[in-house]
Amino acid sequence: MLNDSAIDILIQPIIQRQIKINNYVLGIIAKRIKEIGEILPSDLHKLESLMRSGSDVQKINQQLAILTRRQVSDIQQLIKNIAANSYLNMKRFYDYKEIPFIPFEENKPLQNIVKAIATQTSKTYKNLAKAQAFMIRDLKNPKILKPTSISDTYKTIIDEAVQANQTAGIDYKTAMRRSMRQLIDSGIRYVSYNTESGRVYSQRLDTAVRRNILDGIRAVNQGVQNETGKQFGADGVEITVHEYPAPDHAAVQGHQFTLAEYSKISPTSSILPDESIDTSNYEKTDDVLFDTDGRQYEVFERKIGTLNCRHFTFSILIGVFPPNHTDKELKAILDRNEKGYKPKNGKKLTMYECTQKQREMETRIRWVKDGQMMAEQAGDEDLAKEYQAKVNKYEAEYKEFSKACGLTVKHYKTRVDGYKKLY
């Protein structure tokens, strides 16, 4: 079974392409800002007519369409590869029950499940791509951020640049910095709406895409487990294990449960509880969960494998194979998580909280690298140096924090194609 680090590496090319398209769009706008700033006001109409012809927006839309096709193809292939790996890990259960373990490609029920999940994950990606926009401050009320399509954002910035070029008595670069900062701070985002409250939610598109892919991977892993469990007659599940688990799932990871017991926290599981399982020795309540050794846990609201949970469940034959981790190993994982790290003049963080902070720092580094690149392409050396200083500062803080926590520095998560350090 592929671990989290291996999956991270597998999905990284898809994420990098998503980051690259963000910088492609920012780069086109930046180059036009530079060109407008360098041309004489009397000749501006020549460049303005070219920009208003829509050629830049057409190029952007073409690249977005190409990206979508490639991303969809790679996402579907990734889901299939993950499924094949997950299926192979279940061979020992088929062998134990003396059931033929047919090749992955010939297991029709499994293929149908994998195809459905791959299609759904791709569909979600397409929906994310359709809902992309910049979040720009309202000129009348700067406190309000409004979603603005890429084409409308382009036109607005070009209009501002033309006006700044034609207005006497102002410094062009200074005038354009406000607009550039907004684009850099926003980046291309996935925008969604709450129809009941009317509120707008947004997050960087590369972050949303990453979450979509991980959701698809979890779904296909669980789908394979559910289907294979039916095929070899599973009577229980084992919850997967990873370092630094979230607090609500930390205690149960690595433990085995009967299907009847597990249905308390996952009633919609496609493996139905086996009524023949004897659970009479367990005290059945709505808020208590028992593993196969009779240990008691509080029932939790967030289901396994949902809402950014990295766990899923293996289908198992209870009493046939021992859990993948001993109690001693599971305790060591929880102890490492709780040991955590205490920053100077700050509250103690669990290792789970440290990893969350690490992800935030990686996103911040990518963001300021975007800024340095856009400022460079716009010909604003002062702004580029300002963002470079931020890159240097945030990278140093990231390395220091990771070292203090004992976490691995993941340079591939801070990489931005095309970025070159100024100093």
Identify the meaning behind each predicted range.
Residues 321-323, 352:
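Amphipathic, soluble alpha/beta structural segments
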Residues 152, 163-237:
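Flexible, gly/proline-biased loop segments at the beginnings
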Residues 320-321, 374:
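Intrinsically disordered, low-complexity acidic/polar segments
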Residues 1-184, 188, 328-423:
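N-terminal leader/targeting and assembly helices and adjacent pre-domain segments
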Residues 139-149, 189-202, 263-298, 334-347, ...:
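Intrinsically disordered, low-complexity coil segments
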Residues 203-319, 326-328:
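Acidic, glycine-rich two-metal-ion catalytic cores of nucleic acid-processing enzymes
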